[in-house]
Amino acid sequence: MQKASRKNKKERGVSIKVKTSVHNLSKTQQTKLTVGRLGLGLIIIQHGPYLQITHLIRKGAAANDGKLQPGDVLISVGYANVLGYTLREFLQLLQHITVGTVLQIKVYRDFINIPEEWLEIYDLIPEAKFPVTSTPKKMELAKDESFTSSDDNENVDLDRRLQYYRYPWSTAHHPARRPISISRDWHGYKKKNHTISVGKDIDCDVMIHRDDKKEVKAPSPYWIMVKQDNETSSSSTSSTSDAFWLEDCAQVEEGKAQPVSKFG
């Protein structure tokens, strides 16, 4: 009987020690988060067989709640036990959760430390600093203002360059007119009604000088025709007489012409 009682006492002591050790390892925290535009607002890595929180996204659901901390290990999300989950499996689980859903999150606190390489690259994670309030909008506004100011300056320069090419009238005070073609505007000339007198007199605008003694005649085209006819046809006498007759008629017409003529 005494031996049995001793064994029971030893077993009780051992069982008590195991419970205390498990209690120290399984210090848990739980909270409820509402899925928002940024999800749960957590940056999670796979640390061995566990999913561990490394960073909280600013203005995210977890950061606003304030109960979860970097280093916590996920136990369950909603009704799903995620111990042993990979990141891919956890992502597939979150894909079926819609915005506005309230999830109960349970984690281990002070269970394992975050790897040093993840602590060193905190500044390199853009999600940990997202979203920064009003700075992106201010930057966009500043960019827009710079673009608009540069555009305005360009427009002013263009206005200065083009002001000499604008029409002198405005459409508000003058009726619509058909635009003038550049070739006509630049190369066209205006005809003016002006009478020019041509003749041998000194009073004429254009005076013709002739030497009555030696009258130079231009070579008659009929001589060429006569030569061609002589080479090609046998009736050379008739063609020659016709050519001389035509040339005589031309000389008679020149004698009848007036010495002064006017052109409008």
UniProtKB/Swiss-Prot annotation:
PROSITE patterns: PDZ
Highest taxon of source: Eukaryota
Sequence ranges assigned to domain PDZ in this UniProt record: 22-109
InterPro entries, per database record: PDZ, PDZ_sf, PDZD9
Pfam family, any one: PDZ
Listed name of the protein: PDZ domain-containing protein 9
Gene name of the record: PDZD9
